[in-house]
């Protein structure tokens, strides 16, 4: 898998974190640099760690399912992509919760970062099947998610919900396209 494909996957994976970062920014009373950086570090860090965990798990089963690995990659990426598109229609960005400094604490940020990075775990499994070099992949995923999360907080403080659903739809379409590409490369 090349740099361009990894970058597309990284952008697609970061869309859940981007949408959550928009929500964080939307609900912030002030644009605090400290909280913006916290969001970027948590989301970028978890988006880098989860594919590594998935990769480690995937390598344990790689030999036993190598004849169908392209189907597994296609199915996982398609399911994740379809789910992202479906979730884009939900208005799950509520400011009823406390978005003071306490909502940027370890517990709250860990739970939110974990929730937005579950998809990356499944992608890590597909990386193992495709024999992707994991170190550069997780570096790219983490860095892009960090940057897009910071941008998301800024967008949230300025524009609000306008871009959240569009970002999730784009991420879903990218993942489905990458899954189809992987499948077609193995079938043709």
UniProtKB/Swiss-Prot annotation:
Q: Which residues form a coiled coil?
A: none
Q: Does the keyword Nuclease apply?
A: no
Checking InterPro entries in the record gives: Mntp/YtaF, Put_MntP
Record localization: Cell membrane
Topology versus the membrane, per the UniProt entry? Multi-pass membrane protein
Query: GO CC terms for this protein?
Result: plasma membrane
Q: Which Pfam families match?
A: Mntp
Can you tell me where the transmembrane regions are?
Answer: 2-22, 37-57, 65-85, 110-130, 138-158, 168-188
Give the record's keywords alphabetically. Cell membrane, Ion transport, Manganese, Membrane, Transmembrane, Transmembrane helix, Transport
Quote one Gene Ontology molecular function term. manganese ion transmembrane transporter activity
PANTHER family on file: MANGANESE EFFLUX PUMP MNTP-RELATED
Query: What's this protein's function?
Result: Probably functions as a manganese efflux pump.
Query: Per the similarity annotation, which family is this?
Result: Belongs to the MntP (TC 9.B.29) family.
Q: Which HAMAP family does UniProt cross-reference here? A: MntP_pump
Which protein, by its recorded name, is this? Answer: Putative manganese efflux pump MntP
Provide the gene name from the record. Answer: mntP
